[in-house]
């Protein structure tokens, strides 16, 4: 078993009626972080209460959230980062 330290960004939903108009800029931001190798995965919770994203560093998670159009325009009401020890076979 191998372990890697990851940082999980949790979003709580805010005004979801603003999501569609801000999604193109949000998508461009997460695609940039994926290209840079800083963002490993992301997605919403099925109950629409929020979403989560997994980053390689705390700094990347903070940088992402602070500049995310979803945060800046109220689609997200609150965000937090938690350290996670990812265990994988091998």
Can you describe what each PLM-predicted range is?
Residues 1-90:
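Conserved, structured core segments of small domains
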